[in-house]
């Protein structure tokens, strides 16, 4: 089959969504199909630009390319999943979040524009009307499935997939650090981790790996660490290679991942593959589908006090933390996450 993967791309930004699309393309090609990523440039401000992008997507005709039929369109992200195609399947990573669960959240921007409500209504109307055009609707996780049902009354099926290089993860003896690999940005809550670190009883050390979309945010985090007097217990690794990520995961005491209502989150699955316990929060969304409290990690309230207590616990109870990590690996294996299963579902 000739297959197009429809997504969006914010120039110069690379995260899990881009990795997801590439993983799907590679898996389709490995299965003998011809697959390509159709990435639409996306700008969400001012809000009327969102409407322009929605219209542009609806006007696209990708039923054939250069005289050859496109057999299937797989839509991943808004508004690219609105592109029409007679044989379209959706695997929704998330909707336009500031029009839904983040509408009145401090992270929202849409709510503060005079025309924000009108644009939000237009987004919801389009989703309600056009998502059901697809012959099948899959969600990236149960969290995304629940949002689709709650906000748009659309049924979908959760479809999990493995993280990149899943077969390369390994485990080694735990060293004296917690590892937090993620883009440096407000939704991932590195600030919360720094505030928690300032409250620990023990000399807990945290290694942050990742770069920021905005260099000034990195400066802000480092300034906060100095203000909280935890700079000596923090390591800023910046962007790291895949090999270094594998090594850091393998040698960590635990993995820290407390994002705000994450859609899915490769970090959790990578930790489980490395036999490491995960410390996350009750409002972290996707990770909660995999982390079992006090069995494969710790689920804390999203406060510095609660998170610091979790840090102290794994620091002081290393054998128990190691056992949770091994249980996490077993849990991952029981989930049967595979690209072959994903492709079978998307191409059925």
Feature annotation, model-predicted:
Residues 277-281:
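Short hydrophobic beta-strand element within catalytic cores of glycosyltransferases
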Residues 260:
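Aromatic "clamp/platform" in nucleotide-sugar-dependent glycosyltransferases that forms part
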Residues 205-222:
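Glycosyltransferase donor-sugar binding loop
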Residues 293-305, 313-318:
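Conserved acidic donor-binding segment of nucleotide-sugar-dependent glycosyltransferases
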Residues 309, 313, 320-335, 341:
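A short, well-ordered alpha-helix in the C-terminal region of glycosyltransferases
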Residues 218-240:
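Nucleotide-activated donor-binding/catalytic signature segment of Leloir-type glycosyltransferases, i.e.
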Residues 169-188, 194-201, 207:
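Conserved donor-binding/catalytic core segment of Leloir-type glycosyltransferases
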Residues 108, 113-137, 145:
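Membrane-proximal helix-turn-helix segments that form the acceptor-binding/catalytic region
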């Amino acid at each position: 089959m000739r297959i197009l993967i429809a997504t969006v791309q914010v120039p110069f930004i690379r995260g899990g969504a881009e990795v997801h699309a590439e993983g799907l393309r590679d898996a389709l090609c490995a299965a003998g199909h011809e697959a390509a990523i159709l990435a639409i440039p996306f700008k969400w401000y001012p809000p009327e630009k969102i409407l322009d992008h929605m219209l542009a997507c609806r006007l696209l005709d990708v039923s054939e390319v250069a005289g050859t039929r496109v057999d299937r369109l797989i839509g991943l992200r808004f508004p690219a999943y609105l592109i029409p195609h007679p044989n379209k399947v959706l695997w929704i990573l998330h909707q336009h979040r500031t029009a839904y669960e983040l509408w009145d959240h401090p992270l929202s921007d849409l709510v503060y524009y005079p025309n924000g409500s009108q644009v939000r209504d237009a987004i919801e109307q389009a989703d309600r009307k056009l998502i059901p055009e697809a012959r099948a609707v899959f969600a990236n996780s149960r969290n995304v499935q629940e949002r689709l049902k709650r906000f748009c009354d659309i049924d979908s099926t959760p479809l999990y997939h493995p993280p990149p290089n899943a077969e390369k993860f390994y485990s080694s003896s735990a060293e004296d650090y917690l590892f937090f690999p993620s883009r440096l940005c407000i939704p991932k809550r590195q600030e919360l981790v720094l505030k928690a670190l300032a409250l620990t009883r023990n000399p807990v050390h945290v290694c942050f790996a990742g770069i920021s979309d905005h260099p000034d945010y990195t400066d802000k985090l480092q300034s906060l660490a100095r203000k909280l007097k935890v700079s000596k217990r923090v390591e800023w690794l910046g962007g790291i290679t895949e090999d270094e990520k594998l090594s850091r995961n393998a040698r960590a005491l635990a993995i820290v991942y407390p994002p705000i209502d994450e859609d899915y989150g490769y970090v959790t699955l990578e930790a489980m593959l490395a036999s490491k316990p995960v410390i996350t929060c009750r409002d972290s969304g996707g990770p909660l589908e995999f982390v079992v409290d006090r069995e494969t990690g710790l689920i804390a309230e999203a406060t510095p006090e609660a998170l610091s207590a979790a840090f102290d616990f794994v620091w002081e109870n290393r054998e128990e933390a190691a056992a949770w990590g091994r249980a996490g690996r077993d849990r991952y294996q029981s989930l049967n996450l595979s690209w072959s299963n994903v492709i079978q579902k998307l191409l059925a």
